[in-house]
């Protein structure tokens, strides 16, 4: 095996079957560079296997529905229930039966860069994507729970072709379609995880646009959540039309400044 260079071995490794006798010869190679190469290859292989296993776990509910004859399954999730400013955004995503999105997970577990990359991949492969947006003013008129349900219904109604079944993260969508409510659905269903990415990226982009309109509030940094920076900006500059006046922290600041 010494006649092979490290570069030769690096090219050979992906081609070796599990039972290839050359594995044992490589493991007995005394060169440190070869052993380091083997260790790196095994780590990469283990990571790929973990990603594949994770995908199979995420597809469990979808595969059960496919086996029952359901063809178009929409995952539903939202972003922006907790912030003090900006809309609540819901997304509905129908993935193809043969979809494979390695690295997909609950959007909260992903970096902004990974979310953006997955957003593009989901857009490229999805059968349909629907988005529903409910403004801060509408949230104040209803309440955040009902506003979120309305955003989800809008997202479902925007799907073309329409879904046959819904997988929803915890909530019930006000529509007549059959649906399953999954606790922590964005961590347990590929369709819901895809919807969580679409909803999160869509809302983040919206908040970055608001940051250009209201640069003094720092929306691009905190996305409307109640950070010390955000509270200080509200106290100093007041509230914008994008703030949720029905939310207690905003209401308290308004009372203190006699704006309510």
From Swiss-Prot:
Q: Name one GO molecular function term.
A: manganese ion binding
Which cysteines share a disulfide bond?
A: none
Give the protein's biological function: Endonuclease that specifically degrades the RNA of RNA-DNA hybrids.
Do you know which InterPro entries this protein is assigned to?
A: RNase_HII, RNase_HII/HIII, RNase_HII/HIII_dom, RNaseH-like_sf, RNaseH_sf
Q: What is the lineage of its organism?
A: Bacteria, Bacillati, Bacillota, Bacilli, Bacillales
Cofactor stoichiometry and binding remark: Manganese or magnesium. Binds 1 divalent metal ion per monomer in the absence of substrate. May bind a second metal ion after substrate binding.
Primary subcellular site in the record, as a coarse category: cytoplasm
Residue ranges annotated as transmembrane are none
Main enzyme class: hydrolase
> What gene name is given for the protein in this entry?
rnhB
Q: What is its EC number?
A: 3.1.26.4
Cofactors named for this entry: Mn(2+); Mg(2+)
This chain's source organism reads: Geobacillus kaustophilus (strain HTA426)
- Does the keyword field hold Kinase? no
User: What reaction(s) does this enzyme catalyze?
Assistant: Endonucleolytic cleavage to 5'-phosphomonoester
What keywords does the record list, in alphabetical order?
Cytoplasm, Endonuclease, Hydrolase, Manganese, Metal-binding, Nuclease
Q: For the RNase H type-2 domain, which residue ranges apply?
A: 71-259
Entry's Gene Ontology cellular component terms: cytoplasm; ribonuclease H2 complex
The record's annotation in Pfam families points to: RNase_HII
Homology family = Belongs to the RNase HII family.
One annotated GO biological process: DNA replication, removal of RNA primer
Any keyword Membrane? Answer: no
Q: What name does this protein carry?
A: Ribonuclease HII
């Amino acid at each position: 095996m010494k006649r092979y260079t490290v570069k030769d071995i690096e090219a050979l490794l992906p081609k070796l079957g599990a039972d290839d006798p050359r594995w044992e010869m490589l493991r007995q190679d005394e060169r440190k560079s070869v052993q380091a190469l083997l260790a790196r290859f095994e780590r990469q292989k283990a990571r790929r296997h973990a990603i594949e296993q994770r995908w199979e776990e995420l597809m469990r509910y979808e595969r059960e529905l496919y086996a029952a004859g359901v063809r178009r399954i929409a995952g539903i999730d939202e972003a922006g229930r907790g912030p003090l400013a900006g809309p609540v955004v819901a997304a509905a995503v129908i993935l193809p039966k043969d979809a494979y999105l390695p690295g997909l997970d609950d959007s909260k577990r992903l970096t902004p860069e990974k979310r953006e990359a997955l957003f593009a991949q989901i857009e490229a492969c999805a059968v349909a994507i629907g988005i529903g947006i409910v403004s801060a003013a509408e949230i104040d008129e209803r309440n955040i729970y009902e506003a979120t349900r309305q955003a989800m219904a809008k997202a479902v109604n925007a799907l073309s072709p329409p879904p046959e079944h819904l997988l929803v993260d915890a909530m019930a969508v006000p529509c007549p379609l059959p649906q399953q409510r999954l606790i922590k659905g964005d961590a347990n269903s590929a369709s819901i995880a895809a919807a969580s990415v679409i909803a999160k990226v869509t809302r983040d982009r919206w908040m970055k646009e608001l940051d250009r309109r209201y640069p003094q509030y720092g929306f691009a940094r905190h996305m409307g959540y109640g950070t010390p920076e955000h509270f200080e900006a509200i106290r100093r500059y007041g509230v914008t039309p994008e703030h949720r006046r029905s939310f207690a922290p905003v209401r308290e600041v308004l009372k203190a400044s006699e704006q309510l």
